[in-house]
Amino acid sequence: TLRALSPAALFAPTRADCDLIDQHATWRAIADFRPTLVFHLAGRVAGLGGNLAFTGQAYFENAQINLNVVEGARRAGAAKIVAAGTTAVYSDKAPMPMREDDIEIGPPHGSEAPYAHAKRGMLAMLEAYRTQYGLPFAYMVCTNLYGPNDRFDEVHGHVVPSLISRFHRTQQAGEKQIVCWGDGTPTRDFLYAADAAAAFVTAAESGQGAYNTATGQAQPIRD
């Protein structure tokens, strides 16, 4: 999606190129490239099981990555940041349909609270940097994404890749029953990754502030 816009240069580092938890390595990498536009998509992401098992890591690593990337972008003179948020920032107390102004209503759900608080903190940081430094941003509140190159892992993956992994493992083992949490009635909004990428590009061109990034269609998990 980005390459279709024919940018003069595109730098998409992997973890092997730069550990974003390392402050100085992150600042150095961003300073060396001196980007005009920064898409901040990095984070320590897990499914329900991983979020419950690694609460400290979820908060520390996400908060540290966000601090390093946003400050590094400011130091390097970036003109704008487009950052990936999450619907986990919303509380169960938020009215439906959820609106961007409701992000601070009540605490996040306990199952994802550390991860969600780190993501809320990034929004607060971006707002503070816009106020003090005049750094524009778009904060994309992403729903459940799925698509190529996902993490097909029952601990670290989201709903769709976790279920695919579980079905595949069960089939490979020759088992006849699949054990899933709950009764499948909870609903989620699932968004294809390429559609999310297109929304990010649109936000980079003209967006300011927080945006819910979703289809607007709720689907029961069992479907």
Name each model-derived stretch.
Residues A12, Q23-A63, R75:
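NAD(P)H-binding glycine-rich loop region in Rossmannoid oxidoreductase-like domains
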Residues P13, V38-R44, I81-T87, M140-C142:
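SDR active-site strand-loop-helix element
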Residues D19, V89-S91, P114, A138-S162, ...:
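Flexible, glycine-rich beta-alpha linker
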Residues L48, A83-R99, P114-R120, Q132, ...:
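Conserved catalytic-site region of short-chain dehydrogenase/reductase
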Residues Y59-A63, P107, S111-L123, D153-P161, ...:
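Short-chain dehydrogenase/reductase
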Residues L67-E112, A138:
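Conserved Rossmann-fold NAD(P)-dependent oxidoreductase catalytic core, especially the SDR/UDP-sugar
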